[in-house]
């Protein structure tokens, strides 16, 4: 709770828990925002929030496609969707014929990845998730062609089966040994997109995986690149327009895991770390 980053403040005892939300402006003293506007911002776990539009910490973004469900302002038309779009299109450079692998495929970002990759022309998209139920959801609701259950099968054997010629693009949400296994199977000029490393977030540095196959990036003339979504804020409106158009045409189908009632916020957070959620985890706190 005490760790401070460039984009998040530490929590003090009695603070409101942090979190982005979607809300309707009730009153505004800022000329850029009017009552009735629908915005995304760091509102915290509460039903009413007061945010400072002049403070970049709150990262306010006014939604433009409010005829679509407002829940999309936490999923596909928000950070999860923007992150998947940047990773697949701008860094992964997915194009017709590309073969794509996504880890953490059932999470908030992963649930957008297959739809976006296919909208860009990907030939095959394989997702990694934990458990038969979540893997079924990848194929039924998230656009994946193949789902690999890392809890119930040999991941390395499955990767060899589904990528006999190697992997073109790997969108990594997990890190650790899985990334090492993928590096052993990348094709020439592959792109590895580093989005997260949830397998190691709760580990001490001494417990981090020691990579053995990192040399293959140079050997295969590949590219590995990490990115931070808030470095791209000037493009958010354009990202929103692209994703909204895909939603309207059915190319992108937001997958959302919604709990009701502010009292369920702690449980929603637990679901995230336990991997229970399928799609973007959110809580509806008001009509």
Regions found by a protein language model. Give the residues of each.
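Short glycine/proline-centered loop/turn elements that form peptide/ligand docking sites
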Residues: 28-32, 127-137, 151, 155, ...
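C-terminal capping/lid region of NAD(P)-dependent oxidoreductase domains
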Residues: 249-258, 266-287
């Amino acid at each position: 709770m005490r760790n401070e980053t460039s984009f998040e403040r530490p929590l003090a005892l009695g603070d409101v828990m942090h979190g982005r939300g979607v809300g309707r402006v009730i009153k505004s003293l800022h000329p850029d925002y009017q009552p009735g506007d629908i915005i995304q911002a760091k509102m915290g776990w509460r039903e009413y929030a007061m945010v400072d539009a002049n403070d970049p910490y709150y990262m306010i973004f006014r939604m433009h496609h409010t005829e679509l469900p407002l829940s999309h302002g936490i999923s596909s038309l928000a950070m999860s969707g923007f992150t998947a779009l940047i990773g697949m299109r701008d860094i992964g450079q997915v194009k017709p014929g590309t073969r794509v692998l996504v880890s953490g495929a059932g999470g908030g970002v992963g649930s957008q990845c297959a739809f976006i990759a296919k909208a860009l022309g990907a030939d095959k998209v394989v997702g990694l998730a934990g458990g038969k139920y979540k893997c079924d959801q990848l194929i039924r609701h998230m656009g994946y062609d193949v789902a690999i259950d890392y809890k119930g099968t040999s991941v390395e054997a499955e990767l060899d089966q589904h990528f006999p010629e190697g992997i073109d693009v790997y969108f990594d949400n997990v890190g650790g040994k899985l990334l090492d296994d993928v590096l052993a199977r990348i094709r020439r000029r592959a792109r590895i997109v580093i989005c997260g490393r949830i397998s190691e977030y709760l580990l001490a540095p001494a417990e981090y995986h020691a990579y053995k196959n990192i040399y293959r990036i140079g050997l295969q003339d590949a590219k590995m690149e990490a990115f931070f979504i808030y470095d791209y804020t000037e493009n958010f409106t354009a990202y929103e327009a692209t994703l909204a158009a895909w939603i309207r045409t059915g190319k992108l189908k937001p997958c959302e895991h919604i709990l009701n009632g502010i009292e369920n916020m702690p449980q929603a957070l637990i679901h995230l770390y336990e991997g229970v959620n399928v799609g973007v985890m959110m809580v509806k706190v008001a009509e």
